[in-house]
């Protein structure tokens, strides 16, 4: 289905969720997100969430040479990595912050 520009706002209003599916929070500033390669609509997201998604996609494609089809797997791996249990080793930057916290 082709969605002309003059129908975009009405479509967005009818399809916007209660909260942004990317940032998991309510907003009043919605946009219709689309794949820049295919032009197909992915959904309705917050403007800030859409901006974040664009920055992540551009960085992954341009700097990391991650293909569009491989990006979801990479993002899942990043989420798994961030959620994993931390090692019992303090980084030097952590020591600096700890000393600031202990000696205000």
What are these regions (language model features)?
Residues 37-40, 53-103:
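Polybasic, low-complexity binding patches
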Residues 8-12, 49, 71, 78:
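Generic structural signal of hydrophobic/aromatic residues within well-ordered alpha-helices
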Residues 1-7, 46, 71, 96:
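General structural signal for secondary-structure boundaries
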Residues 5, 19-58:
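Histidine-centered nuclease catalytic patch
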Residues 1-19:
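Short, charged surface segments at domain edges that flank catalytic/cofactor-binding sites
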